[in-house]
Amino acid sequence: MERILVIYYTQSGQLKQIADNFVAPFVGAGIPVDYYEIEMETPFPFPWNNEAFFGAFPESFLQLPQLIKSVPESIMEREYSLVALAYQVWYLSPSIPITSFLKSEQVSHLLSGKPVVTLSGTRNMWIKAQEKIAEMLKKHNAPIVANVALTDRHHNHISVLTIVHWLFTGKKDRYLSIFPKAGVSEKDIASASLYGEMVLKQMQTGIYTPDLQKEIVAQGGVRIKPFLLSAEKKANRLFGIWARLIYGSPHRKFLLKCFHAYLYLAIWILMPIVWLFYWITYPLFYKKISRQVVNAQQSAVSSQ
């Protein structure tokens, strides 16, 4: 008998909404769906405070696991036909709870040989995190058969303001009554059911083909802005330098304050300059950039 497992970690509830919509077609087809919510032994706060938010950076980027509560026996004892892994992105890497689960002792027993669909709901940068997820799943022989990456579609700097308001107040409302709501739009969250239908059709055939991801991309399930693709690659390298510098340092608190200042400088001063230079040179690299976008949309997906 077919059975689906949803593995997720969410703070605001947005990812749970995405996952619920994704599995709705399976539920409608009479296929049982189980949920496993990853729980930390020491929970992260939400809303965040400044110290906790920036303090999570080194361990998050370096993918250092922390203690999580054991997967319930009722989940471990069942066989699943498909796993939906819904994850947050923290600092261009999978969130610490997701990393902790994927590096836990129980994960191989639960995921080995199981096809996986990855679901994410982010501000706008998720590609590097997806690559890191794929690397961890590969070690457990769990192929990614589809990827749905929903993002905040508003302008980069507008989404910075709105996401900060959401993260530090816990309120997903219109900041200052002027800006749009933060996060993935309600319309896009609801659209996850469409991608669920696509996956369901292939699951029923028993074969997942590369055409599945192409269909998801064609229907808007993976949107990539070319400039942010380039910016994310550069940011990933710089984050690596900062994370290794801060982790284990006796001057951790001071260095985290420096990193905070660096982020402010990078987002509000350096990024607009880089953006201008990028678009000036864009015509020269159009074909290369187009290939990179297509590759990223298909990234980390393997057929069975």
Segments from the language model and where they lie:
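Conserved beta-strand termini and adjacent loop/short-helix elements that scaffold enzyme active sites
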Residues: 36-38, 147-150
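Short, intrinsically disordered terminal tails adjacent to the first/last structured region
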Residues: 126, 301-304
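Short, conserved secondary-structure transition motifs
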Residues: 41-43, 122-126, 152-156
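Helix-loop-strand module that forms the ligand-binding subsite of alpha/beta enzymes
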Residues: 48-144, 148-149, 273
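Glycine-rich phosphate/pyrophosphate-binding loop and the adjoining helix
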Residues: 155-231
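N-terminal beta1-alpha1-beta2 submodule of the flavodoxin-like/Rossmannoid cofactor-binding fold
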Residues: 1-83, 87, 92, 199-302
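Charged catalytic carboxylate motif
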Residues: 14, 97, 191
